[in-house]
Amino acid sequence: HHDRGFNPVEVITFDPAAVLGQLIESLPNAHFAVEKADGSYLFHRHFPAYALGDNNIETPLDELVKHQVSRVVVLSPEQEVEEFLDVVARIGLHTVSYAIGYTAWLDISPLGVTKSSALEKIRLQHGIKADQVIAIGDGRNDINMFEWAQAGGGIGFAMGQGPEEVQAAASIVTSSVEDDGVARVLSGFEGILFTR
């Protein structure tokens, strides 16, 4: 186990073999990675340095299916996003939850496990009112989180560099990462004391 700067409260894993088999067949030139329960990654083919953190090991493709994992990541840099979306839609990933990033990037998690399902657990555990939720994101995998926040009366903020459909799903669009969008959102709430 390594220091990630946080302690997981719950890690939900699944067997990635079936879904990886479908993806490898349909996207033979893609790059694949799996996140193990301890937060480390195994990957096949290069991933950007920022994507997997420091604890990652390059491994043969067949090694990826041998572990229970909390996430499968697929990167297909040679494809346009629309083409990638079409391939993923044709595969029909019905036994897992998945979200497409703002490039040809796919995150796959156990069925029913999403950012919003995890955040709802945290919200309930800490007694936070639904209308006090602030969700900030920039990728297609954040749309479900915005919908969850807004359904409870909270606010979804899209980062300025996010794709149009992500911005359209949010309550408000803030500045880009480069222009300190998150800091601008948080400074707008400075001095507000939320009560339970």
What spans do the regions from the language model cover?
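Structural recognition of alpha->loop->beta junctions
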Residues: H1-R4, V65-K66, Q167-V173
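Mg2+-dependent phosphoryl-transfer enzymes with acidic/Ser/Thr/Gly-rich catalytic loops
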Residues: S109-R196
